[in-house]
Regions:
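Conserved catalytic region of serine esterases and O-acyltransferases that act on ester linkages
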Residues: 26, 77-78, 82, 99-101, ...
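Short helix/strand-capping connector loops at secondary-structure junctions
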Residues: 105-117
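Structural recognition of the beta-strand scaffold that forms the well-ordered cores
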Residues: 31-36, 74-79, 103-108
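Aromatic/hydrophobic pocket-lining residues that form the small-molecule binding cavity
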Residues: 55, 59, 125
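Conserved SGNH/GDSL esterase-like catalytic core that processes O-acyl groups on lipids
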Residues: 1-53, 81-88, 119
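Histidine-centered active-site loop/cap adjacent to the catalytic His
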Residues: 116-140
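Generic structural signal for well-ordered alpha-helices
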Residues: 59-63, 90-91
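Sec-exported extracytoplasmic/periplasmic mature domains
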Residues: 38, 64-71, 95, 133-140
């Protein structure tokens, strides 16, 4: 999260990054919603800016918000491309929400910090994209 511009309070906007607060209609129904969140949240825990419990509550609240807007979509959390610090928290929340039986899935990505500032390289992103694509084929 970055100050007041969190995913939870900008999810319903068309382009919060552009400060366009026009509400998204959600009229088109998604088959899947894929998240790749958690790295920066875990850094905030490590820095002592938020607690593990706050991170977990935030994850759960956001997933429930997504579910409200996408009641029949598979919700897929793809994580690990920049480390696995929040993995246990993510898995715990997905389990609490009923896991795959309730349409919540986890896809582990491979860590590779060969890109800029610890980000994955182009090759790693390509490999993780293939991992996610294969997982979505199975899930959908």
């Amino acid at each position: 999260s970055y100050g007041s511009r969190t995913m939870s309070n900008t999810y319903s906007m068309t382009c919060a990054q552009c400060y366009d607060e026009t509400t998204w209609s959600f009229s088109k129904k998604a088959d899947a919603v894929v998240l790749t969140l958690g790295t920066n949240d875990n850094v905030e825990v490590d820095k002592g800016k938020i607690t593990y419990a706050q991170m977990k509550d935030g994850f759960k609240s956001f997933l429930l918000q997504i579910r409200t807007k996408n009641p029949s979509a598979k919700i897929v959390w793809a994580y690990g491309a920049m480390g696995n610090g929040a993995k246990d928290c993510i898995l715990s929340v997905l389990k609490e929400l009923g896991g795959e039986a309730n349409g919540y899935y986890y896809v582990g990505l491979e860590y590779n910090g060969d890109g800029g500032v610890g980000h994955p390289s182009v090759a790693a992103n390509s490999k993780n994209a293939e991992t996610l694509a294969q997982a979505l084929k199975k899930i959908l």
